[in-house]
Design a protein with these regions (language model features):
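Surface-exposed patches in mature extracellular/periplasmic domains of secreted proteins
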Residues: 2-14, 98-107, 112, 146-148
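Extracellular/periplasmic juxtamembrane helices and adjacent flexible linkers that interface
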Residues: 2-68
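Surface-exposed acidic, glycine-flexible loop patches that form ligand/cofactor-binding
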Residues: 59-62, 95, 99-107, 159-168, ...
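Von Willebrand factor
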Residues: 61-175, 179, 202-213, 232-236
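Loop/turn elements at helix/coil->beta-strand transitions in domains of secreted/extracellular proteins
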Residues: 65-67, 108-112, 165-170, 195-202, ...
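Solvent-exposed, polar/charged alpha-helical surfaces in well-ordered, non-transmembrane soluble domains
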Residues: 69, 76, 84, 88-95, ...
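VWA/integrin I-like adhesion module and closely mimicked acidic/polar interface patches used
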Residues: 82-85, 141-144, 178-231, 237-240
Length: 244
């Protein structure tokens, strides 16, 4: 019986077996224990508005600042639905209004780094705190063409990691169809072991995704592979932020 072990089981906190000798021994009055249900009061839950505000305060002011590197595939194979999905992913995470609705909006001290790539990695662009509009514009206007070299782009991401890593929670988000045309995985593994500092790589698949290469990256970095084609991008980024 739970009550013999000191656990109340009755409705409202009352004792169901108050007359049991061993139950009485666990709930002794001389210890100051009141076995009446009247001493146990319910707690009024806060309103939804209060909960929303508390979540916003945590996301934008209390949690450790994040340093996110967005490595986004703009190769020819991403043309059409692939690019459209990747842009929607960026909007879900970096558009202030969309991100706020999912409680993943950037905070005052967050850093976001945008690295577009195809066969070559482009110049990294950085946004401080909530000023992400320029990154979104760059992401929307980037054409999808050329070949694909995921590993070169990730090498650029490693070179853009913060020197003061302890001040941030750092992660790399790779948005791609997973069809890298180069066999540089072994070289990248060596660089990651040297420079990666345990930063997780979260791959989000779009277009005609091939998860095989992405699973290798997840295993290497203790990251994870997500399918961004199911339309529920907010849930994906909430989980990424949960790791973050």
């Amino acid at each position: 019986m739970f009550e013999r072990a000191g656990r109340r089981t009755g409705l409202g906190g009352a004792l169901t077996y108050a007359g049991d000798t061993k139950v009485k021994d666990s709930f002794r009055e001389e210890w100051g224990i009141n076995t009446g249900a009247s001493v146990l009061k319910t707690i009024t839950m806060p309103s939804s508005d209060v909960i929303e505000q508390a979540l916003d305060v945590y996301q934008t002011g209390l949690r450790k600042p994040s340093y996110m590197l967005w490595v986004v595939d703009y190769s020819g194979s991403m043309s059409g639905k692939g690019k459209s999905g990747a842009v929607k992913g960026l909007q879900a995470a970096l558009d202030t209004d969309q991100a706020r609705a999912s409680h993943i909006e950037p905070g005052d001290d967050d850093v976001n780094v945008f690295i577009p790539f195809n066969g070559d990695a482009k110049v990294a662009q950085t946004a401080q705190d909530k000023q992400t509009a320029t990154l979104l514009t760059a992401g929307e206007n980037q054409p999808a063409s050329g070949g694909t070299d995921i590993y070169n782009a990730l090498e650029v991401a490693l070179r853009n990691l913060p020197s003061d890593r302890d001040d941030y929670t750092v992660a790399i988000a790779l948005l791609t169809d997973g069809q890298s045309q180069t066999g540089k995985l072994d070289e990248f593994k060596q660089q990651y072991k040297r420079d990666g500092k345990g930063v997780p790589i979260f791959s989000i698949m779009f277009g005609d995704a091939d998860p095989e290469q992405l699973n290798d990256l997840a295993t290497l970095s203790n990251g994870k592979v997500f399918d961004g084609r199911n339309g529920d991008l907010s849930s994906i980024f909430r989980e990424v932020k949960g790791y973050n």
